[in-house]
């Protein structure tokens, strides 16, 4: 399903591959590599949406020779330059309260922004958490989007107006972004290096997970993994 300005559109059917994961310490999860999905289509199980207005997002499966798991990736390819426009691809087949979400991403282009993000506890296009790595700004920031307003949340132990952390995010190179969310505590990692924690209690219930970009960011994603915390 595609949701744009309140209108739902059913994408072309596609065949995807979902690997089921199981581990006693973390619970059950899924890993999605898009390699059996139809090129040019939105993969099955994914819902396209957008926060704020602007040109419609364009999420589609592409072939990429550099993909961590070849041959396919999921890409947001629209280059609409509306600054406050946040394209979303939501994994529509699972909802969880506590767990970990991980994705590999490559910042391909964008003059306004080159932000690649993970979404969790998603309720609707105007209410969710998101952490994004920005290859133009060279930082990683965690936000809440509440009633359509995006607010940055300072790292634990930092002053209240601290804007994430400065960190090199390479362009045209694959990186791995991860967030663990357990109760009110969120832990952000980039390339297997812990960057910071955030505490917040705005959204405490279960919600969906997914992917996020901003404005004209063209971002490739691969190996999306979501693991639910055991016992939740």
Residue ranges and their predicted role:
Residues 173-187:
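Localized edge beta-strand/strand-to-loop motifs within extracellular or lumenal beta-rich domains
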Residues 184, 189-208:
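Short, solvent-exposed beta-strand-to-loop segments that form ligand-recognition rims
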Residues 148-176:
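Short, aromatic/His-centered strand-loop micro-motif at the edge of beta-sheets
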Residues 87-94, 163-169, 210:
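Beta-strand-rich interaction surfaces with strong enrichment in secreted/lumenal proteins
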Residues 31-33, 203-232:
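Ligand-recognition surfaces built from glycine- and aromatic
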Residues 26-52, 232:
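Extracellular carbohydrate-recognition regions
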Residues 41-75, 82-85:
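Extracellular glycan-recognition surfaces and repeat-rich motifs
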Residues 39, 76-150:
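Secretory/extracellular carbohydrate-interaction modules
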């Amino acid at each position: 399903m595609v949701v744009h300005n309140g209108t739902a559109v059913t994408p072309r059917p596609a065949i995807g591959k979902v690997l089921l994961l199981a581990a006693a310490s973390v619970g059950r999860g899924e890993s999605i590599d898009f390699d059996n999905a139809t090129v040019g289509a939105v993969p099955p199980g994914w819902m396209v949406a957008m926060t704020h207005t602007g040109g419609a997002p364009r999420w589609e499966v592409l072939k990429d020779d550099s993909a961590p798991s070849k041959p396919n990736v999921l890409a947001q390819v629209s280059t609409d330059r509306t600054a406050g426009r946040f394209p979303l691809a939501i994994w529509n087949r699972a909802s969880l309260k506590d767990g970990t979400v991980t994705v590999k991403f490559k910042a391909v282009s964008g003059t306004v922004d080159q932000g690649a993000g993970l979404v969790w506890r998603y309720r609707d296009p105007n209410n969710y958490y998101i952490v994004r790595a920005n290859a133009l700004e060279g930082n990683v920031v965690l936000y809440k989007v509440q009633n359509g307003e995006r607010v940055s949340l300072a790292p634990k132990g930092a002053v209240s107006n601290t804007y994430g952390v400065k960190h090199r995010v390479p362009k045209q190179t694959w990186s791995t972004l991860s967030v663990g969310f357990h109760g009110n505590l969120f832990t952000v990692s980039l390339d297997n290096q812990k960057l910071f924690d955030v505490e917040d209690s705005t959204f405490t219930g279960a919600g969906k997970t997914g992917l996020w970009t901003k404005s004209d960011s063209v971002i490739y994603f691969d190996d999306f993994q979501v693991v639910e915390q055991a016992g939740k």
